Every structure is written in structure tokens, then in C-alpha cells.
Amino acid sequence: MPPWTRCVLIGMTVLAATTAAPRLEACQERVLSLRFSPPAGRANNWCGAATSQMIMELLGEPRTRACQCRQAEQVLGVKGCCVTPSSCLPADELPARCDRPRWPAFVEKPNRYNFSYATTCDGLPGRQNDEACGSHPLDWKALTAEICAGRPVIASVRSLGSANGHTIVVKGFSTRPNKRVLVVDPSRLCPAGRDCEGELDEGFWLSYDEYVAGWDGMVHWVDFYGIKRKQTREN
């Protein structure tokens, strides 16, 4: 490398280090802002729809497409989950056909919801539906990189041996006083005994170790990350 080139690069390196330091420091912890969306109406199995709505709206999906009763109709291939075809309000008497556990809508219906994503079970033939998929949390570096990039993560947990589970949103992290993550459980606000925050105390902190192992009798299942809204829709 010619001497002048080396000098220029050294100068650029010093400048980059000087300007990048504050950004690095700023992302030692971060909490994303998203609208809390609990399962709508009388649904018992819409945690996937609730977590999906929170993230899709944050990333720019119109509420008319992201609302939970609309997701249920699209994912389950049924009608009557919303009060009217143009409404985002769930039916007062929710039909049983509308209330079944499924993955988030952008996972189940990629042709309808134009988002890209990865899972921690992508190495398996059936991805998140593979029988071998289980206990696959994101490592700390990857998880914090997602939050720093402004992308929440969907994590799933389940009872040991169960084929069904529960989804939550990871919207923040901190290293003080130790590695921990801020999660939003759409089925409840601040659980008793937890350190909570948010306008409704909807987010609660877990140590990263607890996040990996599971909590409240549940074990970690699979994480959905790298969630991005595509620029164009393919029909």
C-alpha cells in the first residue's frame, strides 16, 4: 500500500472511531417503542396475531391489514372473525373456527403479508414446524443486534413436550446490572414480582439466562428475527 494511501486510511480510521463511539455507546441498551396489542375480543389463541400486529404496525403495515381478526381470517382461511368484512373489531361471538393457535400471519401467509424473516430453526428441513425444533433462542450478540437495528424479535415458549406454544415480543435489552431483555407478553400486563415498564407496564424484564431457559413453567422454543417489510408486494 502506498504511504499516502495508508496515511489517508489512518486518518479516516481515527475519524470513524471518533464519530462511531457515541453510537456504540448509545446501543449498549435500547428499548423500542411499539403499540401494545393484547389479544382482541374473546379470543384465547391469538397471541400469534397479537405479537404479529405489534411488529407489523411498527414496520409500516396498515392497521386494516395487521389487525388480529383480519389475520385470523387470512391465516385460517375463514370468514366472520371480524364484525364486518371492512371492520377491525372482532366478532362479538367469536366463532370457534376463528380461534385456533397459529404462527404469526407473516409466517403462515407470506403471500398475503409481505415480510421477510429468519428463524433459529432455519437449519432444519421444516424450519419452525420441524419436530427437532426446540430450545433455539437467539444468542446475545444476535438478539441485541436486532434491537439495535430497530427490529423487535418474536420469541416462542411452550410447555415441555407440547405441540402448541405462546409467542411474545422482545423489544429491548440492557446490560445493567446484567444481561437482560425487555419482553411484552400480549396475554397480560406486568406479572407479579417482575420489574416492569411501559405506558401500561406491559413490558417486563427477564435476565438473558432466564430468557434462554424459559420461565413460568415454559421452555424456549424458537425465535423469529430479521423481520423486515419488503419494498414491493408480489401477488
PLM features: what roles do these ranges have?
Residues 13-21:
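Hydrophobic h-region of N-terminal signal peptides that target proteins for export
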Residues 27-82:
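Active-site nucleophile-adjacent alpha helix/oxyanion-hole segment immediately C-terminal to the catalytic cysteine
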Residues 8, 18-19, 39, 43:
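Residues at the start of alpha-helices and the adjacent loop-to-helix junctions
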Residues 26-35, 72-234:
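Conserved active-site-adjacent core of cysteine acyl-enzyme catalytic domains
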Residues 1-9:
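Bacterial N-terminal signal peptides that target proteins for export
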